[in-house]
């Protein structure tokens, strides 16, 4: 799911707080579109950190297994009502099964019967439920077919959008579309509305004469009815959680594409076909990249993407039938500034086909197994397209946005079962820190083992629901490593290490000492000590080398023999660890790093540090060589993020002005930056 509306409100409030704080770092938000840093997340002053509020939630007790939903719908558009006729097929989990509940809200139940015999059943409607009493006790071997006739007037879950005209004169057809995640499909059809039960589904959707219906699975047939309406029969024969069931109805143009022998479909408004095709054009390539990286082919029989108006999120990974906000897709097909954001949105939702649809979180506390993966896979596709520097830039952006949430809102573990509503969990911790944990896991076990373990995880758990322990097991069995420490500190605990590093070179002995302290404040969920494998890059006039250390204590000292004075010291080469780092270095060393670091993250890191040196009041007496290095990088660096960072550093005019201009730039460039607003 890509929930931009809620995310935007949250981030706006956070930015207002940041701009209000007088000690905000002078580095503007403009540079953080793609090149954000662990160093400059605003940490000098924060509001008191809170916990995410809410009560403890557990998986609901389940007494049955739903096998299939067959849903027949037509619509009373003037009254925004769904007229439904549904058959739910289920089996008891234990003997003596006499009654059960389905989730059902905002609907009038007209009849409940056994569809095989037309036997009328007793039922009542407690709040948000449909409680059904069966005609007798049933055993686990017996399949029960329950027919429910109803009329729903949903307050959520399904939406009726009238025909509108955009500011560009574009006509948007009248539409009906659904949005089930996290628990809202029960507003338009009775169901078990929790992710830990998977069933197949079938829909018969009756539309107006000039409309079509798009849904999950394969289109079996279209029937032309005597009254001029059409009925579209869709069938999804792979089991899936109920929140992934969807429909879209409207007057759409259909574009076709393919990945191997799998149909790929794009549904857009008439008159926007060229724009939509350009926006969606990389979908087959994304399918290829993900299939090859995971060594696991696209797992369904088709993939469709449909744009809708007034969508409450940016995108939603309904199984085989993704729904997108029309503005996100059409803007990406029009302007180059929006292209990266649109591609990230498309790759995010597509990757849910593996992580979220095929393999699904067992409950919402485990939702990072859906959303953290989808956010990580965005970066994996960017890496394939633009190289490892682009991938690391995505990780830096994720870190910055996670730091904003941690510093100005609340801190929580990734796996967390306290909330008011499930959607409360769909935050930067879930998406951004979740992606960063996968990045760190990749660095911990190595690239080959990482992708092999993900393949094994998918093979073992396809068509199932999962918990973090299933992922941990897949990695331990694949790599032979014990990884409980990793998951404990990064997934089940909260926060991140805050490191203070000081270096001292001893010319008499040609040795370098690094003093490392973990300074984070421990609490009930934040560890006092993180276990951190770290790479140290050391460069002298005679050459360079990489040292491997492991931090396991609050304070440690490391000594390295050198042949001469260090020209460059990189702590955590390649930015493999989520952290905040306090490591002051002289301007000459940073200027060397800006000019010579092999990876873009090292050059960005140096540019950020130099930016703070030349911003008032630190700018007094600044070495002209620093200005020269920044000017060279702003023009000549091969990576756009480095050029942007260096150029922005040269524009520093002071805290107040930089903060104000930076926030304005952040909003005007949010699409090009593909930030948190784009990927929820």
Segments the model singles out, each with a brief description of its role:
Residues 30-83, 115, 170-175, 186, ...:
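N-terminal, polar/Ser/Thr-rich
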Residues 207, 270, 351, 448-451, ...:
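Non-catalytic accessory/interaction domains
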Residues 48-49, 60-63, 149-252, 278:
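Extended, low-hydrophobicity, Ser/Thr/Pro/Gly-biased non-transmembrane segments
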Residues 30, 130, 234, 260-516:
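Hydrophobic alpha-helical and helix-loop surface patches within well-folded domains
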Residues 2-14:
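Bacterial N-terminal signal peptides that target proteins for export
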Residues 12-24:
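Bacterial N-terminal signal peptides
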Residues 100, 104-167, 228, 553-565:
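A surface-exposed beta-strand-loop module
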Residues 85-106, 192-193, 201-208, 469, ...:
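Surface-exposed beta-strand/loop patches in extracellular or lumenal glycoproteins
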């Amino acid at each position: 799911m890509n929930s931009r509306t809620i995310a935007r409100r949250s981030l706006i409030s956070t930015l207002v707080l940041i701009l209000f704080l007088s000690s905000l770092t002078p580095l503007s938000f403009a540079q953080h579109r793609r090149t954000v840093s662990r160093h400059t997340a605003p940490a000098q002053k924060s509001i008191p950190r809170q916990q995410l509020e809410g009560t403890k939630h557990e998986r609901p007790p389940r007494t049955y297994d739903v096998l299939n939903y067959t849903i027949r719908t037509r619509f009373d558009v003037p009254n925004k009502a769904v007229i439904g006729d549904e058959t739910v097929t289920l089996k008891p989990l234990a003997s003596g099964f006499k009654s059960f509940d389905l989730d059902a809200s905002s609907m009038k139940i007209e009849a409940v019967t056994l569809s095989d015999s037309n036997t009328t059943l007793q039922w009542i409607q407690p709040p948000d439920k449909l409680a059904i009493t069966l005609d007798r006790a049933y055993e686990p071997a017996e399949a029960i077919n329950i027919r429910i006739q109803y009329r729903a007037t949903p307050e959520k879950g399904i939406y009726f959008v009238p025909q509108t005209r955009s500011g560009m004169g574009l006509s948007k057809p009248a539409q009906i579309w659904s949005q089930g995640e996290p628990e809202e499909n029960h507003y338009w059809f009775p169901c078990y509305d929790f992710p830990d039960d998977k069933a197949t589904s079938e829909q018969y959707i009756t539309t107006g004469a000039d409309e079509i219906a798009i849904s999950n699975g394969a289109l079996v047939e279209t029937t032309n009815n005597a009254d001029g309406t059409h009925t579209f029969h869709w069938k999804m024969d792979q089991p899936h959680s109920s929140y992934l069931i969807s429909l879209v109805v409207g007057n759409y143009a259909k574009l076709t594409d393919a990945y191997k022998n799998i149909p790929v479909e794009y549904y857009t408004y008439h008159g926007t076909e060229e724009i939509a095709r350009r926006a969606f054009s990389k979908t087959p390539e994304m399918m290829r990249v993900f299939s090859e990286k995971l060594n696991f082919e696209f797992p369904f029989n088709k993939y469709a993407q449909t744009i809708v108006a007034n969508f409450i999120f940016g995108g939603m990974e309904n199984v085989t039938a993704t729904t997108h906000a029309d503005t996100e897709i059409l803007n990406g097909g029009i302007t180059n500034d929006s292209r990266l954001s649109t591609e990230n949105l498309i790759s995010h939702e597509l990757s849910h086909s593996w992580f979220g649809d095929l393999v699904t979180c067992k409950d919402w506390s485990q939702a990072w197994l859906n959303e953290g993966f989808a956010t990580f896979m965005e970066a994996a596709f960017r890496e394939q397209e633009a190289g490892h520097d682009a991938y690391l830039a995505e990780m830096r952006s994720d870190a910055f946005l996670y730091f904003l949430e941690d510093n100005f809102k609340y801190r929580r573990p990734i796996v967390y079962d306290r909330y008011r509503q499930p959607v409360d969990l769909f935050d930067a911790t879930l998406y951004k820190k979740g992606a960063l944990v996968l990045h760190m896991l990749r660095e911990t076990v190595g690239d080959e083992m990482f992708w092999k373990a993900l393949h094994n995880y998918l093979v073992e758990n396809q068509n199932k629901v999962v918990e973090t322990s299933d992922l941990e097991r897949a990695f331990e069995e694949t790599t032979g490593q014990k990884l409980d420490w990793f998951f404990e500190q990064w997934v089940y605990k909260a926060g991140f290490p805050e490191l203070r590093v000081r270096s001292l070179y001893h010319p008499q002995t040609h040795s370098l000492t690094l003093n490392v302290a973990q300074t984070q404040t421990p609490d009930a969920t934040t560890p006092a000590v993180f276990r951190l494998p770290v790479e140290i890059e050391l460069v002298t006039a005679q050459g360079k080398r990489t040292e491997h250390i492991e931090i396991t204590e609050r304070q440690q000292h490391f000594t390295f023999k050198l042949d001469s004075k260090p020209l460059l010291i990189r702590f955590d080469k390649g930015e493999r660890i989520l952290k905040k780092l306090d490591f002051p270095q002289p301007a000459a060393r940073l200027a060397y790093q800006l000019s010579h670091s092999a990876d873009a993250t090292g050059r960005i890191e140096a540019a950020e540090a130099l930016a703070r040196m030349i911003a008032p009041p630190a700018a007094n007496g600044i070495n002209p060589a620093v200005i020269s290095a920044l000017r060279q990088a702003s023009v000549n660096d091969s990576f756009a993020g480095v050029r942007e960072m260096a150029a922005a550093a040269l524009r520093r005019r002071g805290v107040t002005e930089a903060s104000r201009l930076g926030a304005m730039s952040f909003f005007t460039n949010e699409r090009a930056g593909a930030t948190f607003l784009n990927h929820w």
